[in-house]
Amino acid sequence: MLCLPLFKSHFSFGRSILTLENKEENTDNFPDSIFPLLKQAELKELFLVEDHFSGFLQANKNCADLGVKLNYGLRFTVCDDFKDKNEDSLNSNSKIVVFAKNLKGYKRLVKLYTHASTEGFYYEPRTDWMVLQKIWSDKDLLMAFPFYDSYVFNNLLTNKICQPDLFTDHFYFHEDNDLPFDDIVSNKLNSMDVNLINAKSIYYAKKNDFPAYLTFRCMSKRTTLSKPNFEHMSSDEFCFESWRQANG
């Protein structure tokens, strides 16, 4: 496998048009499910990176029913101090992905997500590095940094000042989606001598689904197609079709 398929489902509200429905094949006029895509590519594992916890039960049940190994990760916003709820604190925001290795890892994810959604909430669920380290266990959790919106990306391209506490082993996803700044981020990661995993974020099935995906995002954010105001939305490469082409 040349690059890892990182799926996201419609449970990450407004971020994907793929569902977690248990069905044999995708058909016209109905939303595409992730599972027939896995079947097409003869994949026995699902790498699912979500922005919201609500889809875990369906993902876990359907993976078990279909004999698919679930690798479940949540994308978190991390800041310097979750107690600082002011505009300046937003300059330290960046994204990480935390994967659960086992049942105890799932329970730790619940704790992290609950804290971020309640005590840490400021415009969105947030946690900080101290809380993350307090709940962390290397036996149960795995840390990764997404290609987009990580501390590397934000410090390099958005003038933010993100200071991560890299207290545990971790790796970085590396992507190429034909965006103008992909090479800039890629060159920076390569210069850091870090553990890289080639990956492809997948939000829809085919390239010609991109207009439907963009429309869905506009509806979710109450914007318009003429002025969507979304980052990273000038490419139709975030799809399963592109992943298959890259993997032969």
Question: Each predicted region: which residue ranges?
Answer:
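Phosphodiester-processing cores and adjacent nucleic acid-binding clamps
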Residues: M1-G248
